[in-house]
Amino acid sequence: MSTAPPDPATDFQQRLSAVEGRLRDLARRRLEGRTEPDPGTGERWDAGQVWAHLGEFIPYWIAQAERVLAAASASPVPFGRTKANPERIEAIERDRNRGTTALWHDVREDLNDLRAFLASVSDRAWRVRGLHPTLGVMPISQIVDRFLIGHLEEHATQLENLRPR
């Protein structure tokens, strides 16, 4: 029996492949309705808003994680944003009507970038810490889980819960 800690990259890669398959299937569907209300804001999104958010958050959070890693600091490195970030809101509004096919194309490329990022993180780097403005100190493994892999899974579930048109 191995006493080595589990490799987060392997788990993240497996989860990424699974959520990519879910999103691929969802991109083929025409969905209507709105998501369940966000627990914090009460906000409800249509499918276009969810796809636009998928298209904007993946590159953003990869860049934030890379920034934390590049700082090579023993102290937690400030990173991130909140839901109220104006650039986030503007990107979602700007792209929500682009169409699922175009947004899925962008998301698929972003997922490939995420796959490459995950492969590039060393075992030691998974413990490097960042400092989020509201969530506090988080190691890279938690940043990736919360803002990338888990976030993708959350929005895939939102899309799955919308009605087919």
Task: Tell me what each language-model feature is.
Residues 1-12, 60-107, 164-165:
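Short, helix-capping/interhelical loops that line the mouth of catalytic, cofactor-
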Residues 21-48, 70-76, 120-136:
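Helix-loop segments that flank and shape redox-cofactor active sites
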Residues 46-47, 99, 139-140:
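Short, structural beta-strand-to-alpha-helix junction motif
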